[in-house]
């Protein structure tokens, strides 16, 4: 399975015989896309060919450690305070389903001076809780009248199917996204419905 669009781009370039034309800057972009789409290579990344591709990108002179720092370790104070608020006030764990939910309203985002990208990775946070294997993040969009939905899972749980069935979306097995047009209360209720529907799969060991 292809880990990301960036990996697909790399494969296409190579298929066309243009690997030698990849610049360091282009290699950095491809690596960054692969890294972010796999959560720092923590999901959708068990195919050994991914690491061969990384070795080829390294041969172009990229500094993967610096890329990681620039993406994940350059947060604003507001983002960290928002993260603390989310974990303490806006996260609900459903141990009976091995699942968790995070949600944010527009008013809450304004309170912390939200900037685009400030919530990047928030959906992954509940997955660090023991036995939680499915996490959903609902965020009222600050530009459109809709709710952005991010879904993450571990193991074989198909969050892409949940995204397609409930949130007009799709994606990878363990990383998907979608949209919801309605109120936050309605979106939360829909999430709870999908827990019931997928209970058996959520409680599987793999």
What is each model feature region?
Residues 38-166, 171-206:
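Hydrophobic helix-and-loop "lid/oligomerization" segment in the mid-to-C-terminal part
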Residues 1-53:
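Short alpha-helices
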């Amino acid at each position: 399975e292809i880990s990301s669009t960036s990996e697909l781009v790399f494969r296409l370039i190579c298929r066309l015989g243009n690997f030698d034309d990849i610049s360091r800057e282009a290699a950095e972009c491809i690596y960054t896309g692969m890294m972010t789409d796999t959560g720092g290579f923590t999901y959708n990344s068990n195919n050994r060919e991914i690491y061969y591709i990384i070795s080829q990108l390294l041969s172009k002179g990229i500094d993967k450690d610096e890329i990681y720092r620039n993406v994940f370790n350059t947060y604003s104070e507001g983002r960290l305070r928002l993260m603390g608020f989310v974990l303490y006030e806006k996260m609900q764990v459903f141990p009976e389903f091995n699942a968790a939910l995070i949600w944010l309203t527009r008013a809450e985002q304004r309170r912390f001076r939200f900037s685009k990208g400030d919530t990047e990775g928030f959906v992954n946070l509940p997955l660090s809780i023991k036995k939680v294997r499915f996490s959903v993040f609902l965020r009222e969009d600050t530009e459109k009248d809709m709710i952005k939905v991010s879904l993450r899972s571990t193991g074989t749980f198909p969050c892409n199917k949940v995204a397609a069935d409930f949130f007009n979306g799709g994606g990878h097995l363990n990383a998907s996204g979608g949209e919801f047009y309605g109120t936050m209360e309605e979106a939360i209720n829909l999430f709870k419905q999908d827990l019931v529907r997928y209970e058996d799969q959520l409680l599987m060991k793999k």
